[in-house]
Amino acid sequence: MAHMDFPFYTPKDAFPVGGAVRDLLLGRRPTDLDYAALDPEKAAEEAKRRLGGSLFPLDPKRGHYRLVVGERTLDFTPLEGRLEEDLLRRDYRVNALLWKGGAVFGLKGVEEDLRRRLLVPVREENLYQDHLRSLRGVRLAATLGFGLPRRTREALGRHARFLQAHPEALPARERVKEELARLLLSPRAAFGLRLLERVGLLGVYLPELALLVGLHQGGVHHLPAWEHTLSAVFHLLWLWPEAPLEARLAALFHDVGKPLTRRFDPEVGRFRFLGHAEVGAEIARASLFWLRFPKEVVERVAGLVRRHMDRLPEERKALRRFFLRRQDLLPDLVYLMAADRLATRGVEREAWEVLGRYEEVLKDPLPQRPLLSGEEVMALLGLQEGPEVGRALKALLEAQAEGRVGTKEEARAFLLYWRGGREAQASGTPDHPH
């Protein structure tokens, strides 16, 4: 194959392999480096002396070591047998590459795979040596923009059916989470999710979402539920290419509650999904916790799913109050609501209204904190520490967002007025106007 200089530090008796070599041949800059070494531990220690970073064993019995230097990861594994034998143990031909002495070595057919941008397993049985490899194949297709020829799709499908029948063979959930996150963070996330479903892996790793496949919706929905979900993911990234993982997960899970809430309403003559956002939030929370996503990610996604059906009020003060109460979910919620509408026939105009009205609110930024502290509120209203202080601060912040309060003096006057209304309600007198 090609002759080239490897542009990264390489320890003695270690050879760059796999994705880093592939990426260089594709004109991409590798983020992580893999090395096959005669003595992986020795090579990893040599790299640490040269580069610094943190070294730790991944699997010392098998000779797997990892060095983390800044944002780059260097993995060291044993060079097993002769060169060709080592390459034959790898997952896909485009990953069965090794750099040695200024030359790149690969298996027969890899040059055509790279030229045609196709993903082909080295051998189908290799998928069963590490059961994450089928999911990794879908992720690679999405991140690299590679196609899956029929033989690959069929091999992945057989492996998916094996995993369905043998759940004990499933990879560690942390590894599954990493592959799914990398797939979703790809610009081609919707394409990758479609492949995941087509080869049968959606039901293996995300069975809650597999229930959306073929689910008829009707009404304004011209697409079945799964196709609508893919369209929402696509439109989210079209509107917001740098969308964070939480927003992408929310787009993926936003309608996951529909299969459990689908009911035919004879009054309107179609199916309805009342409460699907609330049900979906709990399903998303359970699914993502099972996959070992961090708690802060899970809670944000659940909040976005729960709120994605909220309607924007017409009146300006109410609109600012609406966004203030959901400030912790912004801007993700706005883009999710817009993407959901763009994936639905007949309400596309609402997507631009959502974005436009949010942009209008941003011209006068929402307040980040109340003008008075908790201690000042307690002193002013004669309160002890407790939930009433929090309610007072919340009311003050909303008044600031609405434009009714702009100074500390106005804040004090507002809170005294607010307390009068609370006392009037408690005593049973007519409701205070505020």
From Swiss-Prot:
CTP binds at residues 19-22, 90-91, 95, 130-139, 175. Keywords: Magnesium, Metal-binding, Nucleotide-binding, Nucleotidyltransferase, RNA-binding, Transferase, tRNA processing, tRNA-binding. It is an enzyme of class 2 (transferase). Its EC number is 2.7.7.-. It catalyses: a tRNA precursor + 2 CTP = a tRNA with a 3' CC end + 2 diphosphate. Its cofactor is Mg(2+). GO terms for molecular function: CC tRNA cytidylyltransferase activity; metal ion binding; nucleotide binding; tRNA binding. SUPFAM superfamilies: Nucleotidyltransferase (SSF81301), Poly A polymerase C-terminal region-like (SSF81891). It comes from the Bacteria. One of its GO terms (biological process) is tRNA processing. Belongs to the tRNA nucleotidyltransferase/poly(A) polymerase family. tRNA nucleotidyltransferase involved in the synthesis of the tRNA CCA terminus. Adds the two cytidine residues to tRNA. This is CC-adding tRNA nucleotidyltransferase.
